[in-house]
């Protein structure tokens, strides 16, 4: 069974996001194991230090064998079909764990 890790900084506070996440976890859990991993926000006053520390905390929670898919508001947008194809291609090549 494939394993998806959703790794994020801080807790999801918005009720609508919590509800959507719960719905997707319920739907997908028939096909994949899903873990949601929340690392604490860093309180450093300097943004670059905060990003560095949070990045280190995220990386500590990701297995070396995991395929990392970075999700970024400013990143390349892909369709659900393309994401599914990407995951399928990786799975065929032996990858069973993905971290988002």
Description of each model-found segment:
Residues 1-100:
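Post-transcriptional modification and biogenesis factors for structured RNAs
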């Amino acid at each position: 069974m494939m394993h998806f890790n959703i790794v994020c900084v801080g807790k999801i506070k918005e009720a609508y996001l919590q509800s959507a996440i719960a719905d997707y976890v319920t739907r997908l859990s028939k096909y994949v194991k899903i873990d949601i991993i929340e690392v604490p926000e860093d309180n450093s006053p300097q943004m670059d230090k905060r990003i560095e520390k949070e990045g280190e905390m995220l990386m500590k929670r990701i297995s070396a064998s995991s395929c990392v898919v970075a999700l970024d508001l400013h990143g390349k947008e892909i369709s659900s079909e393309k994401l599914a194809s990407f995951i399928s291609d990786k799975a065929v090549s032996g990858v069973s764990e993905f971290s988002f």
